[in-house]
């Protein structure tokens, strides 16, 4: 039988450089990715290096709260 609490949760990854710059004049928005993580394997906040179409480079995307 499956447990009532799901192990995999849906998370949102947001570009840290776009947020830090306060959406400067060069970028027109904030890049966000939707993915899943296993709560048992990675209990801490997830950070991945992904491509940001607003910064035009690979940046660190951190997990945010919904």
Curated annotation (Swiss-Prot):
GO terms for cellular component: chloroplast; ribonucleoprotein complex; ribosome. One of its GO terms (biological process) is translation. Pfam families: Ribosomal_L33. Keywords: Chloroplast, Plastid, Ribonucleoprotein, Ribosomal protein. One of its GO terms (molecular function) is structural constituent of ribosome. It comes from the Eukaryota. InterPro entries: Ribosomal_bL33, Ribosomal_bL33_CS, Ribosomal_bL33_sf, Ribosomal_zn-bd. It is found in: Plastid, Chloroplast. PANTHER family: 50S RIBOSOMAL PROTEIN L33, CHLOROPLASTIC, LARGE RIBOSOMAL SUBUNIT PROTEIN BL33C. NCBIfam families: PRK00504.1, PRK00595.1, rpmG_bact. Belongs to the bacterial ribosomal protein bL33 family. This is Large ribosomal subunit protein bL33c. It comes from Gossypium hirsutum.
């Amino acid at each position: 039988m499956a447990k009532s609490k799901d192990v995999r949760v849906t998370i949102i990854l947001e570009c840290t450089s776009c947020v830090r710059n306060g959406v400067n004049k060069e970028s027109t928005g904030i890049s966000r990715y939707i993915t899943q993580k296993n709560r048992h394997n990675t209990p801490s906040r997830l950070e991945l290096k992904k491509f940001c179409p607003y910064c035009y480079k690979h940046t660190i995307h951190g997990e945010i709260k919904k």
